[in-house]
Each structure stands twice: as structure tokens, then as C-alpha cells.
Amino acid sequence: QALIVIDIQEGLVKENPFDTKNFIINTKAIIQHFRDQNIEVIFIRHSEDEGLLAMGSDNWQVYHELKPQENEKIFNKYYNSIFKDTELKEYLNRKNITDLTFVGMQVEFCIDTSVKVGFEYGYKITIVEDAISTFDNEHLPADKILSFYKEKIWRNRFAQLKTTKEILAVN
């Protein structure tokens, strides 16, 4: 089992994703819970050659409140999928990790793509539904994007969804 923390980076959090405060509070609680259980926590950083998430820039770093510990892996990606050209799948296979729990952003890009690719690869995926976020866009407000993906796309199809409270209740 592993917790995958997807794209919660300084530059994106500064842009105020939906319900930023609770998103970060819940994510911190989930990370701490997994650490307390000695379950692996893996961070994913979206990377660009230039722009908001230019590799090496301050905006590219994992959000400071979620600071990875020295023993925690960080994978950098250039695509919406956490698996494409990252060595993540090989790493998980080497460690016999088959159950993945996802927190992070953005729902309609990297979370959705990674859920579906992970499903195709045979991983059992849990999404912490109150520890994922996104932004309003020209078509839909963020809360509608969240509810659409949770209820119409993922639930009982590609992943199971649990709240932070439900995850924390498990010893």
C-alpha cells in the first residue's frame, strides 16, 4: 500500500484551488496517518521546462506544509499521468505495492488520468474525496468538476472514494 500525493506544489496552492484550507488540512492529516502507520508516502511533482511549474523553481517545490521526509520518494512528471515516463510503476512493482491512495490535484487532469491508468495497470485505487482539488474554469466551477468526477466517473467504476474521516478511522 502507498499514499500518492499528486502535484500539491507551491505554485498551484498559491493560485487558491477550491476549498484550499480544508484541502490542505485534510491532506496533512492523511499524510500523517500514513506515516504513523509506516505506510509509504510518495510525492509527485508536475514539471515544465518553463512556466509556472518550471523544474527547480520555488513554485515547482512540494507545498511547504507537506514537506516530504528524507526517506520519502519524489517522482517528477511531465504528463498528466503519474506513470508516464516516471519509473513509478517499476518502483511500485519492485515493492509489491498494489493498493494506492490518491490525494492531490487537479481533479480533471492528473488525478483523473492517473486513476484511469492505474486502474488499467490493475492497482486498487482509493481517492480521498475531500483531499483532492481543482480550480474553476471557463466551463464549470470547481465544486461541480469535483462532484462530476467523484459521482459520475470514478465511484464504483475506477476507484473507491473515502473521506479523510473514514481513512483516519482505520487503524
Predicted regions, residues:
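Short acidic, Gly/Ser-rich segments with clustered Asp/Glu that frequently serve as metal-coordination loops
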Residues: 9-15
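N-terminal nucleotide-binding beta1-loop-alpha1 segment
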Residues: 4-7
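Active-site-adjacent betaalpha module
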Residues: 1-2, 29-32, 52-171
